[in-house]
């Protein structure tokens, strides 16, 4: 069977003993995990049920860094959800790794204050990347086959408000 060591190599294993108390395996971890997707995802918090699916799929796709942010359209109660607790996050990240046959756990940063995050942290985060913000009214086409690291900001259900789009563009983002 396929096996992997969290944040380590992947390989194969064979069960050698199984009983009521334990399972023993011979394991060989001889391959590097898949290359990470060169994407930092900045994601406005969504309903917890949707968040569970999104974080699992991001992990399965090979994204290695997600930053959860607040937005005017995000309900305050979402930030109190148990899904944001460390153990709960780990559960959904591991499910994604299993689906993606990967072992490198993505980093989840939680930034519940929009303006301080955009002004104080975001300029350093986007250095060396192409920063895009998903915006339904953007005139710019979303590029493909970019071939370099990128940062993508995705708004909440209902989208970022004009002030938030303005702040992201001032920081260096292109609306697509």
Please provide the spans of the model-predicted regions.
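N-terminal positively charged helical leader segments and presequences
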Residues: 1-31
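Short connector loops at helix/strand junctions that flank enzyme active sites
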Residues: 10, 20, 34-38, 61, ...
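RNA substrate-binding interface of SAM-dependent RNA methyltransferases
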Residues: 33-132
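Short, solvent-exposed amphipathic alpha-helical segments in soluble enzyme
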Residues: 57-61, 148, 167-170
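Short, hydrophobic beta-strand segments that form beta-sheet elements in well-ordered domains
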Residues: 130-136, 155
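Strongly charged, low-complexity linkers/loops
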Residues: 135-146
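A C-terminal functional module that forms or caps the active site or interfaces directly
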Residues: 147-166
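Structured adenosyl-cofactor binding patch, chiefly the S-adenosyl-L-methionine
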Residues: 162-176
């Amino acid at each position: 069977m396929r096996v992997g060591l969290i944040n380590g190599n992947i390989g194969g294993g064979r069960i050698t003993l199984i009983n009521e108390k334990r399972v023993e395996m011979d394991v060989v971890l001889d391959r590097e995990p898949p290359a990470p997707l060169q994407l930092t995802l900045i994601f406005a918090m969504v309903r917890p049920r949707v968040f569970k699916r999104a974080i699992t799929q991001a992990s399965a796709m090979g994204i290695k860094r997600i930053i959860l942010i607040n937005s005017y359209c995000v309900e305050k109660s979402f930030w109190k959800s148990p899904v944001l607790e460390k153990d709960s996050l780990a559960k959904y990240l591991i499910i994604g790794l299993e689906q993606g046959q990967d072992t490198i756990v993505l980093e989840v940063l939680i930034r519940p204050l929009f303006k301080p995050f955009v002004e104080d942290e975001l300029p350093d985060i986007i250095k060396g990347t192409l920063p895009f913000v998903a915006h339904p009214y953007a005139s710019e086409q979303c590029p493909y086959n970019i071939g370099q690291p990128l940062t993508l900001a995705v708004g909440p259900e209902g989208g970022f408000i004009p002030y938030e789009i303005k702040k992201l563009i001032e920081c260096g983002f292109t609306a697509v």
